[in-house]
Structure formats: C-alpha cells, structure tokens
Amino acid sequence: MQNMVILGATGSIGASTLSVMVNNPADFHVYGLVANASVQKMLALCITHQPEYAHMVDENAAMELKSLLPNHCVTQVTTGAEALNALVTDSRTDTVMAAIVGAAGLVPTFDAVKAGKRVLLANKEALVMSGELFMHTARASGATVLPVDSEHNAIFQCLPTNVQAQLGYCDLSANGISHILLTGSGGPFLNTDLATLSAMTPAQACNHPNWSMGPKISVDSATMMNKGLEFIEARWLFNTQAEQLKVVIHPQSVIHSMVQYRDGSVIAQMGNPDMRTPIAHCMSYPQRIGAGVEPLDFFKVGQLSFCEPDFDRFPCLRLAMQACEQGQEATTVLNAANEIAVDSFLKGRIRFTDIANVNYRCLDSVQQTRLDSIEDILQLDEQARATAVSVISTLN
C-alpha cells in the first residue's frame, strides 16, 4: 500500500490520478491532497477520499475549507510553505504526484526529490527551470523520478531497463539509440490559415482535438510551446544532445512517442489519448495495473499520419529549442515569460500571436548568470515575469 500525496489535486492530472487510485484501492492510499484555492473541489475530494491532510496554498481558502469540512471528516487542513514541505517530506509519504502547473510546482517537487521520495513528474517546469540541479539532487538523494507526461512516459517505456534505471545520466549512444522521436498532435490550429491566427480566441485555443487538459496546457499545445517544454524536459531526463531529439507532428495522438535504434528499429508506445495510462504506469512501475482506459482499437483508428513541424506556424517551438541550446538561464526565462503571456491571452489582454512575441522579447533579454540553487532560479523567474509584464504593457 503506497501513501500518496497529490500536488495539484483539483486539476485534470489530479482527477485522473484519483481515478486510477479508486480502480486500485488495495494498492494506494490518499494521504495528502494539495491545491491552490479551489475550495469546493477540495471539499468534495476530502469527503470522498478522507485524506489525512488537505493543503491549500491560499490561506483564505484553507480557512474556508476548514470551516466547511463536516465533523466526521478526519482531514487536517494546512497552509503555508513549511506545512507543504512537511507533507511532501513526511516519513509516511511514499509517493508524490507532482502535478501543479507552472513554476508554483517547482519548490514542493524539488523538496520531495531532495527527501528521496518516489516522484511522479507531471510538472514540466521542474525540469525546464532546474533540470541539471533537479536530476543531480535526485541522484544524490536516491529519489525515484518517473515521467508522467504522455510523451516522456512513452519514451521511458521504449527504453532498455538499464537506461530506465539511469535517468538523467544514461548514455543513449552506448545503448544503440540514435534518436528520440517526440510526437505532438499540432493542436487545434494545425491547419488554420496563418493569416487568421491572430484572431483566435482562448476558447478556440483550448478546444484540443484529442486531449482533455487544463487551460494553460491547452494554450501551450495550440502554440506548441508544450512540445518545446517537453523537448527541454527530454534533454534532462534522457541526457540527450540536441541532434538526438526530433519533433514529429502526429495529429491522431495514438503514438505517444518513439525511440529509434541504430539497427534501424523504431519502438513506439501507442494507446488511446488518456492520461490515466501513463499515470497508472508510473504509479505501479515496474508492475502493471488497470487504468480504466479502453484498449486501442486499430480498426477504428484507421490511419496514422505524420509531418514535420512548421516553425512559421509554431514559433514558440523554435524558441524553446533555441533556449534549450542556450542553457538553463534561457529556459527559465522562457518558461516564466510564457506563463505570463498565456495568462494574459486567457484573460483577453493580448492576441494569440502575441504570445510568441512576448516570449521572444523576454528571451532576447537573457543575461548569463549562474543558477546554483533553487533560490537563484526563483529570482531569475521573478525577474523574467516582471520583464514579460513590461513587454505586454507595450502591446496594449
């Protein structure tokens, strides 16, 4: 029985994780749930799952949740950075699902890794912002890091077991691997007239053809920044060189990624586009459990298609790949700028095509600095956010 803490419990990954847990009640126990400010959602989860702890990042939300919990509920409500650190490092916490979207998830995820926990990594920003430091800390603490992102989980499943055991430090070439093929659907605007992209609305950007995701990740999919961040993640997870990574547009989202070997073989991981599959894989690794997902029906799929990414259509993807080449400072700045830009787009303050413009201008402002600690990274993140806000003010 694994005691699990879910960071981002009220989001889509949190919901999928709880669904897998309900399917496998003898194997997993909900020990702690963490959310930002969604009181009603957290209240319902506490009543249903009866966790020992419910942590709200927002202090007022924590007070409201505490007042609403029925007397029979055993859950203890906490708030504050110290309480969150105590929860993820608690000796009774076995596994941490890191699913808080954005830079907000970096510190608790890093704390869990530092404590040597089994960390199921759904938070892209942990590696985008602190990849080298993150993987070094995991190695030093003995933490187990398993990738939840469907693409990285697919790559992981296609790798030899000895490579799986050396994430962050594996030698792909020595194991006969020539390329990692990172697939992406191309999002809702894959075939949209380029001249009309500036008029696309948040609702249109969030209408993904295959996946059910939160608003921020949906917009990132529409710009393909999502794939760019995954490109950076893959660099750190699988210790790749830029020439070993390729992005492939695959609109059907059936092949979640592939590994190409020196002998000409290509191993692909396939399945219906449902996050419960990679979540269940990580939760039970190296075993397999039921995820509640319908098996892939090849007769219904019919055909699979592929194409190269168009960087005129997806400039954010190019920016992310360039930032990956520049180093950790650039990827940290790009991530921060993108979060501010996407939030502004979702609030109707900038156009869809302005997202790439904001990202480019912020990335262009990167100054070389050493990032030796989480504090250094968070300071640069804060500076980049301020720069993004300033850039956006010139667009209005």
From Swiss-Prot:
Residues holding 1-deoxy-D-xylulose 5-phosphate: K124, S150, E151, S185, H208, S221, N226, K227, E230
Residues that hold Mn(2+) according to the record: D149, E151, E230
Pathway: Isoprenoid biosynthesis; isopentenyl diphosphate biosynthesis via DXP pathway; isopentenyl diphosphate from 1-deoxy-D-xylulose 5-phosphate: step 1/6
GO molecular function list: 1-deoxy-D-xylulose-5-phosphate reductoisomerase activity; manganese ion binding; NADPH binding
Needed co-factor(s): Mg(2+); Mn(2+)
InterPro entries: DXP_reductoisomerase, DXP_reductoisomerase_C, DXP_reductoisomerase_N, DXPR_C, DXPR_C_sf, NAD(P)-bd_dom_sf
Pfam families on file: DXP_redisom_C, DXP_reductoisom, DXPR_C
EC number: 1.1.1.267
GO annotation (BP), single: isopentenyl diphosphate biosynthetic process, methylerythritol 4-phosphate pathway involved in terpenoid biosynthetic process
Keywords of this entry: Isoprene biosynthesis, Manganese, Metal-binding, NADP, Oxidoreductase
Similarity comment: family membership: Belongs to the DXR family.
Function (record text): Catalyzes the NADPH-dependent rearrangement and reduction of 1-deoxy-D-xylulose-5-phosphate (DXP) to 2-C-methyl-D-erythritol 4-phosphate (MEP).
Protein name, entry field: 1-deoxy-D-xylulose 5-phosphate reductoisomerase
Organism: Shewanella frigidimarina (strain NCIMB 400)
Taxon lineage: Bacteria, Pseudomonadati, Pseudomonadota, Gammaproteobacteria, Alteromonadales
